[in-house]
Amino acid sequence: MADILTQLQTCLDQLATQFYATIGYLSTYHDNSPAIPPPDVPDAAPALAKIPKNSTAPPVPAGAPVPALSQASPPAQNPAHGAAGAGTSVGEGAQTPGPAAGAGADPNLPAPDSPRTFASRQRELARDLIIKEQQIEYLISVLPGIDSSEAEQEKRIRELEGELRQVEEERELKMRELKRLRRTLENVLTAVETGLYGDRELLEKYA
């Protein structure tokens, strides 16, 4: 099993991957509908009235009264250009946004999910992010010395060093005792082997 720091790094990498996947899903499968602010929340910047061409008047909010200067009759135009200008104005005014505005969209993009499916997957992605974040918080909470000061950690390190030296000394004593017992066992086996084979040789000699 990996140590806590390795697990923490793995969880952070997984969290970054989940963030990337979540943003990718939200960017790909939303329905591209415009955001509609609640009616009780005012806009940060009020809409401005349409500014006439070549006007020097400052912009005003859409609901403000129109200044007297802008109400004056526009300058006379050349009759030769009047019809063309009128035709242009009518043509521009007749253009309205509709389904044809999205005709240039990329046909390779997947179709957006239904609102119900999109909301369900949003909740699922959010739940996965919360679970991963809770795992990270738990791993951080069980790190050794997370609630200790620097002096306390140094003191604990010195205590562990002393315990490690003591355990090393005990290990060396056990190793020496093991070697002594091994030599004793070898001597016993040698004596037994010598006794058995020595008696057999005597029996064969006097048989």
Curated annotation (Swiss-Prot):
Biased composition, class Low complexity, residue ranges = 91-108
Origin superkingdom: Eukaryota
Q: Which region ranges are annotated with the description Disordered? A: 36-120
Database matches in Pfam families: Med21
Task: Using the record for this protein, list the coiled-coil segments as residue ranges, or answer none.
Answer: 146-194
Q: Which GO terms describe its molecular function?
A: transcription coregulator activity
Q: How does it assemble?
A: Component of the Mediator complex.
> Under what name is this protein listed?
Mediator of RNA polymerase II transcription subunit 21
Supply the source organism for this entry: Aspergillus fumigatus (strain ATCC MYA-4609 / CBS 101355 / FGSC A1100 / Af293) (Neosartorya fumigata)
